[in-house]
Amino acid sequence: MENISVNNLVEEFESSLPREISISIAKNILNSKISKENAISEYKKNIGLLEKKIQRQVINCTGTLLHTNLGRAQINPRFTGGASNIEYDLDQHKRGERNEYLTSSMNLLLNSENVCFVNNNAAALFITLSTVKNSSNIKNVIISRGEIIEIGGSYRLPEIIESSGLKLQEVGTTNKTDIKDYEKALKSNPDSILLKVHRSNFSIKGFTKEVSIKELKTLSTKYKAHLFHDLGSGLVIDRNFLEAKEIDIFNSEPTVQESLEDGSDLVMFSGDKLFGSVQSGIIAGKENLVKEIKNDPLFRTYRCSPLILFELQNTVNKYIDKNEMSIPIWSSLLMKYEELLARVDDISKKISIDHKIFDSESLIGGGTMPDKKLLTPAIGIPSKNIDEDLRILSNQEIPLIPRISEDKIIIDVRSCPVEDDEKIIELLNKL
C-alpha cells in the first residue's frame, strides 16, 4: 500500500485549525502505524472533533435566555481591539485611575458609594470575605441554613467561605429562619458578619419564613456587624419601566438598588445574568469597604480586562439612558407574544420540512428565577434521527442549537435576536 505523509494529510483535507495543530494531529496518527485508509478516516475525525471545540458564535434556539453553556447574557460588542485609555487620563496626559468613568456611572445607576469589578460573582464573594477577615479581624459568617446554596459547576457556598479563611455558622432551619436566630449567633460570636444569599436558582414554598435586609440591618447596627448581600442575578432595572411594560414576573426579585437602600453594606452580583452584560462580578456599597477590597493584594489577581470593563461601561450607559430594550436580555424577555408569532410564522413559510407551530415556554436560565416561564410560540420538527439532525445543525460555520423534546427538534426564537432568523431558515432547510 502506498505510504501517506503528514503533508499529504494536511494539504488534502482543509481545516480551519492552525496548520501546526493539523500537522501535530497527522504526526500522532501516522506514528500509530495504522493503514492508509484508517489514517485518513482518523485524521478527518480528529480534525472535525477539534474544530467543534473552537469557541464560536452559535444561534441559541433553546428558549433558555441566559443559557449557562452558551455564555449566559448575549451582548452587542462594541470594542474590537486596539489600545484603550483604561488607566490614562486624557485631560492630564498621564496615568489615571483605572475605569474611573465606569465606577462613577455605576455608582449613579446603583446609588452606591463605591463599586469595584472582578472576574465573576464567586470571586466577588471570596475577595469580599477574605478582605474583611484580614482587615477587621472577622472570624465567622452567619447565614441562614436555607440560603446555603449550590449553583452550576459545583460552586458550593460553604467551600467559598471556608477558602476565605472564615468559619460558616448556620442559623435557623431550611424552611424557617427568624431574626432571633441571627441575634443569638451574634451574641455568641460578635466577631462575625451577616451574609444574606438570594436563592436565585431554587425556591422554597409553603411553611416558610426568612429575614429581610431591613430587619438584618437593624440587628447589624445594634451589634456593629457588617451586613453583606450576595444577590447573584443582579436585577438593576427600574421598577417603573417594568410596570410600564406590564411585566410582573420580577415583583419578588430584589434589585441591587433596593438591597443597598434597605441597608446592605455591600452587595455582590453577576454581570452576565439579569444585568445583561459580560461575565464579571460587581461589588457595590460602602466607600470604605470597597476601598479596602481594591487595596487588597488579591484584588489585582481578580480584576477585569479592558474588554470586560468596556462592555460593562456600554451596558451601564444603556441603563442610564433609559435604553433598556437595546440590552439583549431585556429585548428577549420583554418581546411580546405577537412579535414572536410573526417571526415564527415567517420562518414557517420559508422552510420545507414537516413542522408544526405550537405554544411553548421559554426559561430565563442562568440559575435565575427557575419557577418563572414565558409563553412563547415555537416550531416543532418531528425527527426520525435526532442525532443526525443535530449533527447537521451543529456542523455549520454558525451552528444552530435547538431544544430537544421527545422526538422533536424545538426552535424557540425568544432566545435569539431577529437578525438570526434568515440563518435559521437556511439551516433548517438543510435537514
Residue locations for each model-derived region?
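Long amphipathic N-terminal alpha/beta scaffold segment
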Residues: 36-75, 104
